[in-house]
Design a protein with these regions (language model features):
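Phosphate-binding glycine-rich loop
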Residues: 1-17, 28-33, 41-43
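Short N-terminal helix/helix-N-cap motif within the alpha/beta-hydrolase-1
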Residues: 4, 23, 77-78
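Short acidic capping loops at alpha-helix termini that bridge into adjacent secondary structure
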Residues: 14-17, 63, 148
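Structural detector of well-ordered beta-strand residues that form the stable sheet scaffold
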Residues: 19, 40, 93-95, 124-126, ...
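Short, acidic/turn-prone active-site loops that include or flank metal/cofactor-
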Residues: 24, 44-48, 98-99, 169-170
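Structured binding elements
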Residues: 36
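Active-site phosphate-binding strand-loop segment of PLP-dependent enzymes
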Residues: 47-101
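PLP-dependent aminotransferase class I/II
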Residues: 66-70, 79-81, 88, 100-225
Length: 225
């Protein structure tokens, strides 16, 4: 059953609010609208890129009926905190999972991630976590007066690294969902994140080439969250 069906089956529709992340997944906001409810955006945890329980609690109202939690880039959301919030407030908590990969592929990506974690400089590498499958290896490229994310991406693409910006525009900035809300971590993540290649089929030489291309730009500061 899809998100629309699950919301309708739970009796959620006209007059209800459903909290969703604005960092990606415009399709979720669309599905909330199709169910007849109003999508409300909450900020993310800067380490997980998933909904932050404190931020969800802050935007929940008497009209809030559900929260849709998205597991991001292969890292599980903090379901314990969000589940407890749902129980306390009487909210339906739905999970929006990512496509799974064979165990061998996941194991190779995890090994690649460990290699990159120990060798990349000038970018903030993803925070390791139990169960992280590294569907995408997402780093931060803060500006700090030095090469920003977009300039960094152009430079390493020029060296043959196939990187991509995972979320170009947060959902609350799209014309059809524009909201006058303050989501600083969502905005910062959209400005700073860059997905580097981590396919299980990559060779050690390809990983070394990736590291060399990134580290050649060197010296970016890594501010704390």
């Amino acid at each position: 059953m899809g998100t629309v069906g699950m919301l309708k089956a739970a009796g959620i529709g006209l007059g209800d609010e459903v909290i969703v992340p604005a960092y990606g997944n415009a399709d979720l906001a669309d599905e909330v609208v199709l169910a007849g409810a109003l999508p409300v955006f909450a900020d993310i945890d800067p380490a997980t890129y998933c909904l932050d329980a404190t931020a969800v609690d802050a935007v929940a109202t008497a009209r809030t009926a559900a929260v849709i939690v998205v597991h991001r880039f292969g890292r599980p959301a903090e379901l314990a905190q969000l589940g407890e919030l749902g129980r306390r407030r009487g909210l339906l908590v739905l999970e929006h999972g990512e496509s799974s990969a064979p165990y061998g592929e996941v194991a190779r990506r995890q090994a690649h991630a460990k290699y990159l974690d120990g060798r990349l400089t000038g970018v903030r590498t993803p925070e390791p976590a139990r169960g992280h499958t590294y569907q995408e290896y997402v780093v931060r490229v803060p500006g700090n007066g030095r090469p920003d994310r977009d300039a960094f991406a152009r430079a390493i693409r020029g060296k043959g690294v196939d990187c991509r910006v995972p979320v170009k525009t947060p959902v609350h900035r799209l014309p059809e969902f524009r909201r006058n809300v303050v989501l600083p971590e969502t905005e910062r993540a959209a400005d700073e994140t860059l997905a580097l290649p981590i396919q299980g089929s990559m060779t050690r030489r390809e990983l070394q080439r990736l590291v060399s291309a990134c580290n050649a730009l060197g010296g970016l500061l890594q501010p704390a969250f």
